[in-house]
Curated annotation (Swiss-Prot):
Keywords: Ribonucleoprotein, Ribosomal protein
Protein name: Small ribosomal subunit protein uS10
SUPFAM superfamilies: Ribosomal protein S10 (SSF54999)
PANTHER family, A to Z: 30S RIBOSOMAL PROTEIN S10 FAMILY MEMBER
Recorded GO MF terms: structural constituent of ribosome; tRNA binding
Gene behind this protein: rpsJ
GO cellular component, as recorded: ribonucleoprotein complex; ribosome
Subunit structure, as described in the record: Part of the 30S ribosomal subunit.
Keyword Ribosomal protein: yes
Cleavable signal peptide: none
Keyword Metal-binding recorded: no
Amino acid sequence: MAKQKIRIRLKAYEHRILDQSADKIVETAKRTGADVSGPIPLPTERSLYTVIRATHKYKDSREQFEMRTHKRLIDIVNPTPKTVDALMKLDLPSGVNIEIKL
């Protein structure tokens, strides 16, 4: 019989919130009797933006801004219906983006 697997990808700008959310998901899945692998840290995506400070001239004066996107991966193997219901009712912070693949 083929194993059923739920793959959850989490993305956030702050790694503390991301790790707390991942811990909540792992704890909920383990409590309901599913096998969990993760959270696996994925490479951090780094975006760098360079902006001219002045409005019209002085091109040599620039400012740089950086935005980091932290990512985690969680695999839930053989989830029970109880696991799926518990994950649907789980309350996570608004700064965390969640992608779920079955």
